[in-house]
């Protein structure tokens, strides 16, 4: 996952990624690699989370993340420190909130330069008052009920949108 606004990057150590190639890519494009493993509880097992957009949303001024899904304490601390040192506000969410798609959000910037955080109704409903206040200090929240997509498809709003980081012409 690339975060162009902060020149940072993250990757999971999984069968689907190559750490050496990732580091080389980051060096070539002047990104800072942040490598970690992330898991979710399924029954009595801890199973891998394969996409960062399930447990993390990176916005201009803040990062919403489920640090509890990073089981390795050193990796968790590295991720947390990287976020804080980048100058972004850290907003922690729980695994229960991840199940409600609270990590699957996307920041959009409208034509007036206003930050808008798009999320599902279930994600918004899972936020506590402090989390909601922290977000709304930086972004306007827009949510919609996409329960059918979340239940049948297993994804949420972030999975349905793509970012474009091209300069305006």
Segments from the language model and where they lie:
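Internal alpha/beta core interface subdomains
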Residues: 17-18
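Single conserved hydrophobic/aromatic residue that forms the stacking wall/gate
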Residues: 1-8, 12
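Histidine-centered active-site/metal-ligand motif
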Residues: 1, 51, 159
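Redox- and metal-dependent alpha/beta enzyme cores, enriched for Fe-S-associated oxidoreductases
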Residues: 21-133
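Solvent-exposed, charged helical/coil patches
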Residues: 13-14, 70
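Short, flexible loop segments at boundaries between secondary-structure elements
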Residues: 40, 140-152
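Conserved, well-ordered active-site substructure
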Residues: 100-112, 117, 151-169
């Amino acid at each position: 996952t690339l975060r162009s606004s902060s020149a940072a990057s993250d990757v999971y150590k999984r069968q689907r990624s190559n750490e050496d190639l990732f580091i080389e890519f980051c060096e070539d494009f002047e990104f800072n690699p942040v490598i970690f493993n992330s898991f979710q509880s399924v029954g009595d097992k801890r199973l891998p989370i394969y996409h960062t957009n399930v447990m993390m949303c990176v916005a201009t001024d803040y990062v919403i993340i489920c640090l509890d899904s990073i089981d390795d304490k050193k990796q968790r601390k590295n991720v947390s420190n990287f976020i804080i040192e980048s100058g972004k506000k850290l907003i922690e969410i729980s695994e229960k909130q991840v199940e409600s798609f609270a990590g699957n959000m996307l920041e959009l910037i409208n034509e007036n330069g206003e930050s808008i955080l798009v999320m599902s109704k279930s994600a918004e409903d899972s936020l506590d008052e402090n989390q909601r206040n922290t977000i709304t200090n930086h972004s306007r929240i827009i949510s919609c009920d996409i329960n059918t997509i979340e239940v049948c498809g297993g994804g949420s709003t972030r999975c349905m949108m793509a970012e474009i980081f091209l300069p305006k012409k």
